[in-house]
Amino acid sequence: MSYYRRRLSPIKPGEPIDYKDVDLLRKFITERGKILPRRITGLTAKQQRELTLAIKRSRLVALLPFINAEG
């Protein structure tokens, strides 16, 4: 059984998650562009939902890539 190191959230409770804050959103996606799960990010359920929506919005307006092309 493997254990994940729970990361402390850089987002304070009640702090808004903005889709234009690309530096913050990049902390919650993998090198390939996938959204990290809640058990790794340490966010609350509500924060994780808001984060997912913000990442998807920023992908639609081309602030973040859908996938990171390698090579």
From Swiss-Prot:
Gene3D superfamilies registered for this protein in UniProt: Ribosomal protein S18
A GO CC term attached to the entry: cytosolic small ribosomal subunit
A single BP term in Gene Ontology: translation
Pfam families: Ribosomal_S18
Molecular function GO labels: small ribosomal subunit rRNA binding; structural constituent of ribosome
InterPro entries tied to this protein: Ribosomal_bS18 (IPR001648), Ribosomal_bS18_CS (IPR018275), Ribosomal_bS18_sf (IPR036870)
Keywords of this entry: Ribonucleoprotein, Ribosomal protein, RNA-binding, rRNA-binding
Family: Belongs to the bacterial ribosomal protein bS18 family.
Function: Binds as a heterodimer with protein bS6 to the central domain of the 16S rRNA, where it helps stabilize the platform of the 30S subunit.
Binding partners and assembly: Part of the 30S ribosomal subunit. Forms a tight heterodimer with protein bS6.
Protein name: Small ribosomal subunit protein bS18
Organism phylogeny: Bacteria, Bacillati, Cyanobacteriota, Cyanophyceae, Nostocales
